[in-house]
Amino acid sequence: MNLNILGIDFEDWYHPQLVQPFVKNLEHDPKIINGIKKIIELLQKNKTSATFFMVGELLEHDPSILDLILDNGHEIAFHTMTHSNLNELTKEKFLNELDTFDNLTDGKSKGFRAPTFSLNRNTSWVIDALLEKKYLYDSSVVPVKTQLYGFTNCQLEPFRISNSSLTRNDPNGELLEFPLMIGKFFGKTMPVSGGFYLRFLPLKTS
């Protein structure tokens, strides 16, 4: 039996890495918050539950989002406080962000996804940081190499990840990894989930 798990990266238009250099010093009024009720209505209509990987500053802006998500049977998870690439953070700063998000969510968050899927050999410390804060799973691994992120020779099904084994099951790993979905398009293997791919690929494919 195949099991599909839906994760939604809840971030605004100014959060993606490619946009940030152009809007870094500008004030932002989050617009995505206005769409949360519509998203939840669509999920209810399709009898679907989802995990919302939340950028923490959006929850700071409107704390009521938390109850809206949880009361409708969905899950909250961490996507950093400001959508910072992991390469821009230290372990200490990341731990502080985890504490902040824990306070915002009353300890409800047990999962994490790295912005821009920036988990790599240089940022593998994040696995230990998540374990220190009693997190249960990660969903940052893209099991195909792209220009910006991803891995080669990676397991496609969920596996136990560790800071020394980011792509294959580590029997001693304590954190569960849910890799992103990939598929073939015109004979080329590529990710088929995530905002860019959902916009770019035909509806039947994505």
Regions found by a protein language model. Give the residues of each.
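Short, well-ordered coil/turn segments that N-cap beta-strands
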Residues: 1-4, 46-50, 72-75, 106-110, ...
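Active-site beta->alpha N-cap acidic-glycine motif
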Residues: 1-72, 141
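Conserved, mostly hydrophobic/aromatic
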Residues: 9, 43, 52, 76-79, ...
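Active-site-proximal loop/turn and secondary-structure-junction residues that shape catalytic pockets
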Residues: 10-12, 56-58, 80-84, 116-118, ...
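Acidic-and-aromatic substrate-binding clefts and catalytic sites of carbohydrate-active enzymes
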Residues: 28-32, 51-63, 84-94, 115-122, ...
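CE4/NodB-like, metal-dependent polysaccharide N-deacetylase domain
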Residues: 37-45, 49, 91-123, 128-137
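Structural motif corresponding to the early beta-alpha repeats
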Residues: 74, 78-92, 110
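Active-site-adjacent pocket scaffolds in enzyme catalytic domains
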Residues: 114-206
